[in-house]
Amino acid sequence: MLKIILFLLFLTPVCFINNMYWMVQIMLFFISFIFLLMNNFMNYWSEISYFLGCDMLSYGLVLLSLWICSLMLLASESINKYNNYKNLFLLNIVILLLLLVLTFSSMSLFMFYLFFESSLIPTLFLILGWGYQPERLQAGVYLLFYTLLVSLPMLIGIFYVMNKTGSMNFYLMNNFMFNYDLLYFCLLCAFLVKMPMFLVHLWLPKAHVEAPVSGSMILAGIMLKLGGYGLLRVINFLQLMNLKYSFVWISISLVGGVLMSLVCLRQTDLKALIAYSSVAHMGIVLAGLLTMTYWGLCGSYTLMIAHGLCSSGLFCLANVSYERLGSRSMLINKGLLNFMPAMTLWWFLLSSANMAAPPTLNLLGEISLLNSIVSWSWISMIMLSFLSFFSAAYTLYLYSFSQHGKLFSGVYSFSSGKIREYLLMLLHWLPLNLLILKSESCILWL
């Protein structure tokens, strides 16, 4: 673990050397492969200090962070090309990655809180510094206020836990059970906003639409997983409360997931559609997680990792069209089958992954989640069937509207994709489909 953290620390000065953009990118790839070979598949903490360590649960998410961050640099080639403060951009991404690695590998609840909140700052800089429209200021304010409003109660909750148990270590707190309503809400709300749960999701589509492609990738890929990861960690000692209140969150998530799917069906903005579909997916993750069944926890973890790769890839595809056509509107992104025939393959593969078609990791996650939610209450089948149906519906809508139909007449010439873009898509799609062969790693952590 320490070698990763020091590696990232020493990568920060490299960002300021001229023409080192691709060097940093290759270095991040390199470190993600090193980390891939570091797995021990043992369900204990490999500790490096009193508050940093890594177990199977954090391993997958740290790997996802390293992978997505190296792909972010691959996707943001235009920043390098037009020299849009690229040194600061690199620095921003490396610091963000460092904070994320520290978040996922902290064993102390307070350290987790510290890095959890501080990873917001580089994300905000990404949106405000490299976003496209002037409305990005509003998106930044939304992002900041939604998250910070609930983070103070969480801090108070953490100190209460510290006061009662005398420890903040995740492993030592598993022996305790709290039966205190206020603590439950304090600790849970911060993660619900970060997930985001329906009703507190409004910052997400806004942030996605205004963010540059790298901001969208990190937001969809990792930031949404922070909430799920935090829940998986704290749900252990909040079990008694959760049995009492979980029906509220599960109902909101399932109904909200269906409503979000319906909202997806009337989007004209490519990025907004993918953002709203993220809310629907994270709704089912949240519902499965709060059932507190074995299948539910494993399924939520699986779907979190799968969704990180899948929606990140879709945002990259939307950006490829945006760079060619200068618009994200579905009225202009039509008939892309004529425009970029080879990209249609990637559109299809990633859209089908979003629908949870086999052999993707999404399928495994969704089947486990459906199992767990139905075992919690069979009435939820009503909402789940709608959710599955509309999920397929809006994905097909996204695919068919953007790829088929007449080409928009304002498009001058057809253009093929660059090798860089095909590589980017392949590196999103390949782990998504190969991880199903190593699916026991999504279960072993529990």
Swiss-Prot record:
GO MF term set: NADH dehydrogenase (ubiquinone) activity; ubiquinone binding
Top-level EC class: translocase
EC number: 7.1.1.2
Family annotation (InterPro entries): NADH4_N, NADH_UbQ_OxRdtase, ND/Mrp_TM
Pfam families, sorted: Oxidored_q5_N (PF01059), Proton_antipo_M (PF00361)
GO annotations of cellular component type: mitochondrial membrane; respiratory chain complex I
Listed GO biological process terms: ATP synthesis coupled electron transport; electron transport coupled proton transport
Keyword annotations of the record: Electron transport, Membrane, Mitochondrion, NAD, Respiratory chain, Translocase, Transmembrane, Transmembrane helix, Transport, Ubiquinone
Regions crossing the membrane: 4-24, 56-76, 93-113, 114-134, 141-161, 182-202, 212-232, 245-265, 272-292, 297-317, 330-350, 373-393, 426-446
Main location as per UniProt: mitochondrion
Compartments (UniProt record): Mitochondrion membrane
Topological type in the membrane: Multi-pass membrane protein
Catalyzed reaction equations: a ubiquinone + NADH + 5 H(+)(in) = a ubiquinol + NAD(+) + 4 H(+)(out)
Similarity annotation: Belongs to the complex I subunit 4 family.
Function: Core subunit of the mitochondrial membrane respiratory chain NADH dehydrogenase (Complex I) that is believed to belong to the minimal assembly required for catalysis. Complex I functions in the transfer of electrons from NADH to the respiratory chain. The immediate electron acceptor for the enzyme is believed to be ubiquinone.
Protein's name in the database: NADH-ubiquinone oxidoreductase chain 4
The species this protein was found in: Drosophila yakuba (Fruit fly)
Encoding gene (name): mt:ND4
